């Protein structure tokens, strides 16, 4: 949607890293070049024995989206979707925290800030970094941080974010 494409447009001016809890590939399809998936990726299959080993991942395609019962990964274990199930560790959380710790601008889109551990990433934002939250719903924000809240749907909020970050931009 326009929100995804708007984030891609920001890559022309900023070093953008997307950290997402979504398991779809919409950011990649829109053209984002650096995406960290906290909860895995629906279009990847992995080893049930070693799910976080990218050498054992298989990329699924629209032509081949099913994993059949009994299908094996390269290490001989059962093949499974590369999705973080309830109760499993979030393998990319440390990588995400390191990226957040380098941010000059941190943008939260479509989050209640209630789902942990992802909601805790805001604690890693450096002092002095600008923080924006885009969500049409009222969200309780941490009182110890200055957060600019844009109560808008994602597409409209990203457009407004671009206006604020790139006031001279004429592509809006």
Question: Each predicted region: which residue ranges?
Answer:
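Conserved catalytic alpha/beta core of Sir2/sirtuin-type deacylases, generalized to analogous enzyme cores
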Residues: 1-172
């Amino acid at each position: 949607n326009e929100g995804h494409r708007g984030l891609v447009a920001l890559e022309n001016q900023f070093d953008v890293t997307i950290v997402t809890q979504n398991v779809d590939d919409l950011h990649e399809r829109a053209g984002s070049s650096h995406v960290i998936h906290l909860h895995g990726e629906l279009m990847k299959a992995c080893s049930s024995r070693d799910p976080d080993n990218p050498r054992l991942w298989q990329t699924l395609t629209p032509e081949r989206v099913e994993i059949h019962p009994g299908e094996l990964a390269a290490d001989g274990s059962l093949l499974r979707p590369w999705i973080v199930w309830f109760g499993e560790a979030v393998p990319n959380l440390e990588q995400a925290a390191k990226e957040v710790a380098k941010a000059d601008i941190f943008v939260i889109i479509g989050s209640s800030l209630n789902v942990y551990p992802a909601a805790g990433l805001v604690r890693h934002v450096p002092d002095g970094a600008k923080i924006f939250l885009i969500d049409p719903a009222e969200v309780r924000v941490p009182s110890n941080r200055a957060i600019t809240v844009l109560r808008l749907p994602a597409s409209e909020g990203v457009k407004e974010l671009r206006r604020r970050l790139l006031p001279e931009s004429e592509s809006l």
